[in-house]
Amino acid sequence: MVQAVVGANWGDEGKGKITDMLAEKADIVVRFQGGANAGHTIVNNYGKFALHTLPSGVFYSHITNVIGNGVALNIPLVVKEVQGIVDRGVPAPKLLISDRAQIVMSYHILFDQCEEERLGGKSFGSTKSGIAPFYADKFSKVGFQVSELFHEELLAEKVQRICDLKNPILEHLYHKPALTPEALLEELHSYRDMVKPFVADTAAFLYNAVKEGKSVLLEGQLGSLKDPDHGIYPMVTSSSTLAGYGAIGAGIPPYEIKRVVTVSKAYSSAVGAGAFVSEIFGDEADELRRRGGDGGEFGATTGRPRRMGWFDCVASKYGCRLQGTTDVAFTVLDVLGYLDEIPVCVGYEIDGEVTTDFPTTALLEKAKPVYEKLPGWKCDIRGIKKYEELPENCRKYIEFVEKHIGFPITMISNGPGREDIIYRNEK
């Protein structure tokens, strides 16, 4: 069976933990989109890790981890991540990298940095990982596929073409030194040597695995609201964040995806710019940020303080719908145990009218949150294993959210560890 783990909101929902947990019973874990611009935090017996490109199955010796064709592949970072976990006592993971994946080049990162600098106060809040320039090149058909690293004549011709294309912009718009074909060839040769042991036709591998009845877990990055088509455009990422894209980014038939686990926090958080209707500020936000996550709410990639807010039923209902959700995993519920009452955003007021439908960005910028307040439970719920053992007000909070988003909450995370999970109403 193929199942996907994806995000309902702006990313940072806790997908890494849920993937790590579900991976125990999987044979293969696949990253199918995005790059090193977001991190998945995992806490296990080896310690606490922030993975940026490696699939979250790397901590299990029985799993084959696949980086699919849809990923923005930063080869030095992948190799560094592998070495980083091995240095901390994790056995070397089984890893396959698609021969059709495309490569994040050093000039993609340079262009990303230069453009953010040029835009100044109107920037997109990029992590400066080269993602937008990478995908721009991919769809302009001037990117480098992994398979091309092994064809020297093709590389020699292509690097000259890249220099001719990029240098006018570098020199005249950004006032930076020109690229040289020699330097680009040297960079590509170093990438070839690094990636060679892992390269495979991963689409064929996955096709055969599915045919044999293997359990495949597709691991998404970011969340529905960062999708370039359906999210808070233009403050979005550059690849689709939806489970449906898993078929494309991994190279498997769409009808094989039987289960979609959509992860949502019990409150809201976001990194980067863009509309965030239930956002809170000041001491209220600082307190939630300090208590949140595992060691505070700070970006796994940038270390930036995350923007904080209360749970948003409007955004989460929309995000779950887009993902084709079969199950919701509700995370970091334990964080809210300090509150006397908990506000939940149940609607948006736009131009004097209240809606429960998620609008396009122009209207979203004008939206004001409509809150209902629920009583808190004022205790620590870590260590609880059964739903019935949760405090009554905690159960009421879960059931209130479930009713408003319209999708079943079947997993509740009440701590950072693998074992901190409560299963509920699973089919």
Task: Give residue ranges: language-model regions.
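Non-transmembrane, aqueous-exposed alpha-helical and coiled segments at domain scale
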Residues: M1-K427
